[in-house]
């Protein structure tokens, strides 16, 4: 994982790249410089500067952690630390037991039995509107869904790299799981309890607290 490079306006950040947002090109030398303070980010041949403190900007496929803020009309609105709440449609979740069928009016009446206000969930960015920026998420994969028996931590989303795997397991005793949401929300949980409501043990609380404190120090 490459080191983060923090720059201020006027800092030289490279050459031979396509200049993205937060940069400008010197017309005489074609060198690329930062136009804002932030973190240098490169993807393919594009180089840009992301503001150090900004809202999360979603990409399709991002793994996220979010909090349900409202339930209505066959959908949930979810806080994902972005410029607007994300939408989770009833059709974009797994029904209990993994049943495959069309959602009906009865399901809409019992939506709070799936997720209710204040619940924490993991999911994936399904779509981002081209013109309105509307954020759609889904939890259809079995690895996503309701989160319990853990702690939520917020970090700067600009410091989180997009990786192949955002879900990790620490083989301590007891085992602790970590979900690094690309949106800056990090979830630390006791894996032995899974997603049930059984209280976690004192030993699990200590392990969770140790990992949480380590992340806070690094952030």
Which residues are covered by each model-predicted region?
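Single-stranded RNA-binding regions, centering on S1/OB-family and related RNA-binding modules
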Residues: 1-219
